[in-house]
Amino acid sequence: GNLDLSLINILNTGEVFNLYWKSDNNKQVTFNASIELPYIFKSPLGVRANLNIFKQDSTFQNTKTALDLGYYFNYNKKLFLGYQSTESSDIQNTNNALIADFENTFLTATFEYKNYIEEPLFPEKTKFIFKTGFGERISKLETNSQTFFEINISHDLYLNKNNVIHLNSQNYYLKSSNYITNELFRFGGIQS
């Protein structure tokens, strides 16, 4: 099954609520829920929260939570400082060098720029998101300091009124002294 719901500005305060659930024949289950509340008390400050759950068949499950406090330069430019944590469970309890139970925590900083146009189907013409985090991973094997960088860029090239080329780039870098398979960044498929 598949569910992809996005509610934008339903309370007329600029809030965004997203809900995404996907379960496919490959025994993967993805659940993402997020809420963003901008301009709290009519100030340029806002908050957002995310919950991401990913289950890979009977191998492992990752649960990531994030809470960010943001400053809105304007509707197109935002800066967030936040806290992100992930808890991963090795469902088979093998706890070897490839897959293991772990918890990580990061202090994060995110800059977002989005350029919107008046197009009902594709209102987001340009998007640039840069996110970095500094923290540590604790597993049964060891504790490691970690740093990550994430860059997402997309742009729509309008050839004419009826034809658009959508360019999209997702980049992720994780610096660690060693890596566990269930902590690696996953992307791809029809949504990429």
Predicted features and spans:
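Gram-negative outer-membrane beta-barrel proteins
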Residues: L11-T13, N25-K27, F41, K55-T59, ...
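C-terminal outer-membrane beta-barrel translocator/porin domains of Gram-negative envelope proteins
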Residues: G1, L107-S192
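Outer-membrane beta-barrel translocator/channel fold
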Residues: L51-Y72, N76, G82-T105, N171-S192
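Solvent-exposed loop/turn segments connecting transmembrane beta-strands
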Residues: G1, L19-F31, I53-T63, D101, ...
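Outer-membrane beta-barrel initiation region
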Residues: G1-V47, D101-T105, E112-E124
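Transmembrane beta-barrel domains of outer membrane proteins
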Residues: S6-I8, S34-P38, N50-N52, D68-Y72, ...
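Transmembrane beta-barrel strands of outer-membrane/channel proteins
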Residues: L3, L19-S23, V47-I53, L81-E87, ...
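Flexible, solvent-exposed coil segments and beta strand-coil junctions
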Residues: N9-V16, S43-N50, S85-N95, T126-E136, ...
